[in-house]
Amino acid sequence: MRIVKLTEDTKKDILTNLLKRSPDNYGSYEETVKNIVNDIHSRRDTALFEYTEKFDHAKINADNVRVTEAEIEEAYTQVDAKLLETIRKAIVNIRTYHEKQKQWFDSENNGTLLGQKVTPLAKVGVYVPGGKAAYPSSVLMNVIPAKVAGVGKIVMTTPCNAEGKVYPTTLVAAKEAGVDEVYKAGGAQAIAALAYGTES
């Protein structure tokens, strides 16, 4: 991590450099992502597996793309008991917060009905980054609101390493939060697979 000290003397240069990261510089990335999304849409699993090998250096296929219960059980053996306790406490806290956002109705003295209606989707896809570090908080902050809302099925994708392994803390957080299926895929190709579906 680069630490930058913002002072009156350095402020102008720092802000100028930050503003250089404008959307104008993202054209080539956008084109790359569009090509990946279109390729997943047309070639589905074949494209997903090719991109996973290209970007994550992992050879996945229809037989190993989905995380198994055995892999989840193994992940539990690799997560410290104190961390597991922290994950469980975070789940309670996040659930408590989001339950306050559930639907409610009230009526005014003049008969006006006010409120919020929450209609959950039947199934959602959740993407959790994981190329260089584990992000169990991303699992919890995406999955728990969906569970509180009443989503019926939650499918998650997250990158695996070259050996086809997913970070243990990510898998444990997914299991504890109630994810139904976890797939080993990252990046734009994983998000496109969630959106369009593939054979696996």
Predicted regions and their residues:
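Short, structured coil segments at secondary-structure junctions
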Residues: 150, 177-178
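Conserved small-residue-rich beta-alpha loop and adjacent elements
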Residues: 106-172
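N-terminal Rossmann-like NAD(P)+-binding subdomain of aldehyde/semialdehyde dehydrogenases
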Residues: 1-122
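Conserved NAD(P)+-binding/catalytic subdomain of aldehyde/semialdehyde dehydrogenases
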Residues: 178-200
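Active-site-adjacent beta-strand anchor residues
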Residues: 41, 157, 184
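Positions that flank functional sites
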Residues: 55, 161-162, 189
